[in-house]
């Protein structure tokens, strides 16, 4: 955490959200206090994000009032979806009244079913199991529906598909309290890069198609996407050696600002003030 804070300061990243997929999980006040104490040694401000469910297990909800009082700014089962819609609905309401927002990782694991990259022409040619875009779109639409019906906010993490982008845009225009984010790789890179079977291009959600990249880019430009995040998830080279068995995730902290400027500012799609705001 401290080393990441130092790197972040060098990359002009002043604030960081510490997601709850830590050991131990950020599901109690004691862990939040520990993180904030350690953060004092770093040169950046750290904002803890608590977990929605204890141990990220998806079943027993955390005490949101306790987490918020300890210093959490939001809750999320980072990297995992809350499969049970009833639990998610209850979490969205309780988080709202506790003064926090739910950040949803939108992924239907039954559809993912062991897939390792975007389902499409490239996955078929490589002969590997693909992840259908419906895995993201279905849960995104569920969260939007819950937010609209319950009249509480929801934040959609790392949007990667054109359909999810359009659903969020439409919902926001009709007054649903939905915000969202994306990462540079989703408006810069496509699944074509996986033809080389390079696991460095494996991430979750997976790289999609050129049409999705275009849709995400348009979402950034028209303001549907509220912020660009790093989605920093580095792994050692040896972990990425086997294409089919490698974990998902890429370095983002050191590259996100430069990547955003390259893709959006130097192509005249955004002005510097817009890029800074993102």
Question: What is the predicted function of each stretch?
Answer:
Residues 14-111, 115:
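Divalent-metal coordination cores built from histidine and acidic residues
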Residues 28, 110-123, 164-171, 186-198, ...:
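Histidine/acidic-residue-rich catalytic or RNA/ligand-binding cores of hydrolases
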Residues 125-153, 200, 221, 227-228, ...:
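His/Asp/Glu-enriched, well-ordered alpha-helical/loop segment
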Residues 160, 169-174, 178-189, 219-221:
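Hard-cation-handling environments
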Residues 46, 75, 105, 154, ...:
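Divalent metal-coordination and catalytic microenvironments
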Residues 1-2, 6-13, 271-277:
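Conserved small/polar residues in nucleotide/adenosyl-binding loops
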Residues 79-92, 155-169, 206-214:
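Active-site glycine- and acidic-residue-rich loops that bind
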Residues 69-73, 96-99, 173-177, 199-200, ...:
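Glycine-enriched alpha-helix->loop->beta-strand junction motifs that scaffold or abut catalytic
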């Amino acid at each position: 955490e401290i080393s990441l804070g130092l790197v972040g300061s060098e990359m002009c990243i002043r604030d960081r959200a510490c997601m709850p997929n830590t050991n131990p999980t950020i599901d109690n006040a004691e862990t939040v206090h520990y993180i904030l104490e350690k953060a004092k040694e770093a040169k950046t401000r750290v904002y803890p994000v608590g977990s929605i469910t204890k141990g990220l297990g998806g079943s027993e909800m955390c005490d949101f009032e306790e987490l918020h009082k300890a210093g959490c700014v939001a809750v999320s089962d980072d990297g995992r979806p809350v499969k049970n819609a009833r639990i998610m609905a209850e979490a969205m309401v309780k988080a709202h009244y506790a003064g926090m927002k739910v950040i949803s990782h939108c992924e239907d694991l039954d559809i993912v079913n062991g897939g390792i990259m975007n389902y499409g022409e490239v996955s078929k040619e490589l002969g590997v199991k693909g992840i259908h875009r419906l895995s993201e779109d279905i849960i995104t639409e569920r969260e939007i529906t819950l937010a609209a019906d319950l009249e509480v906010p929801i934040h959609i993490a790392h949007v990667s598909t054109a359909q999810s982008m359009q659903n969020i845009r439409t919902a926001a225009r009709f007054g649903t309290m939905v915000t969202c984010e994306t990462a540079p790789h989703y408006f810069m890179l496509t699944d074509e890069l996986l033809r080389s079977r390079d696991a460095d291009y494996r991430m979750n959600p997976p790289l999609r198609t050129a049409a999705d990249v275009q849709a995400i880019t348009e979402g950034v430009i028209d303001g549907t996407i509220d912020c660009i995040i790093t989605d920093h998830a580095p792994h050692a080279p040896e972990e990425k050696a086997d294409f089919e068995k490698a974990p998902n995730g890429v370095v983002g902290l050191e590259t996100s600002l430069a990547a955003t400027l390259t893709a959006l500012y130097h192509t005249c799609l955004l002005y510097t003030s817009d890029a800074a705001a993102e």
